[in-house]
Design a protein with these regions (language model features):
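Juxtamembrane transmembrane-helix boundary motif
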Residues: 1-31, 38-59, 73-165, 175-186, ...
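A structural-propensity feature for long, helix-poor, extended segments
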Residues: 65-72
Length: 286
């Protein structure tokens, strides 16, 4: 037995993570997200079953999710870039404030209580769910993205919130760009590039933030802290990454070939369910 699990249970967990990798990669391509909205709740359940201590469980999920997003987002960005759909002007304005936001989020992760990660995830999941399910073309903030300080503030907020949630930023940047009248396909493509900017420094930040936690739990068994770099689980990342790389280009192909309304509603419902799961976790302390 490993981490209190028999071989059958370990195999089931491994197969679940592989399947989730395929789904997260596909969604990374379709929505321009890194897949963290799928990965974080599944990692949470897997780490709970494996007996990871509650104090480090949520940040370990977030850090591992950001690590998985690195290759997935790069693959997705390359596919969108080849189609000429990425708005490089937005990237030039946003890259620095996003990176600063990621660094700030990583510092918060080192000292924040575990509940904070869940609260941020719930708030954003519910907001994005409402936008995806009930959103209308008339829901706008302006005819085009703002210039000057407000645009950079948006970038900073995307960076810090994405880092605390363990996502690639696509949920935020998609919402912002479409609220300002940008075509959904351009928003998706540009978001895939932002996920690269967020995931690399974000994962490194969680490795740094989680280093003290690894020393705090020296007796935790094999599937848990010893097979992690800080708040990044190597086992979780290795199981999820390969399939996510395979399916990301398939998601890009689907994004440019189909109506997104059905997928938007389905994903919005999923986010609502995930948010509700973490609400119950906050209430019950599990």
């Amino acid at each position: 037995m490993i981490a209190g699990l028999d071989i059958k249970e370990l195999v089931e967990l491994a197969l679940l993570l592989i399947a989730v990798g395929a789904l997260s990669g596909f969604l990374a391509g379709v929505f321009g997200i890194g897949g963290g909205a799928i990965l974080v709740p599944v990692f949470y359940e897997c780490f709970r079953i494996a007996g990871v201590p509650l104090d480090v469980r949520m940040p370990l999920c977030v850090g591992t999710s950001l690590a998985v997003i690195i290759p997935t987002s790069i693959r997705s960005f390359q596919a969108h870039y080849k189609r000429g759909a990425v708005d490089m002007t937005i990237l030039r304005v946003w890259w620095l404030p996003i990176v600063i936001g990621v660094v700030a989020g990583s510092v918060i992760a080192r000292y924040a209580p575990e509940r904070l990660f869940k609260i941020v995830f719930v708030a954003v999941a519910y907001s994005a769910s409402a936008r995806l399910i009930f959103g209308r073309d008339s829901w706008t903030l302006g005819d085009d993205l703002p210039q000057g300080p407000l645009m950079r503030i948006y970038g900073f907020c995307v960076g810090i919130l994405s880092t605390l949630m363990g996502i690639g930023g696509g949920l935020f940047s998609n919402l912002l760009m479409t609220f300002y009248g940008r075509p959904i396909h351009q928003a998706v493509a540009t978001s895939s590039a932002l996920a690269v900017l967020i995931s690399i420094p974000g994962a490194l930040g969680y490795i740094y933030a989680g280093w003290p936690a690894a020393a705090t739990y020296p007796g935790v068994s094999a599937l848990q802290i010893p097979f992690a770099l800080g708040y990044v689980s190597l086992i979780g990342a290795v199981l999820v990454m390969p399939m996510s790389l395979v399916t990301a280009p398939l998601g890009v192909r689907a994004a440019h070939a189909m109506s997104k309304r059905t997928l938007e509603v389905a994903f919005g419902c999923y986010l609502f369910l995930v948010g509700s799961r973490f609400v119950m976790s906050l209430a019950g302390g599990q």
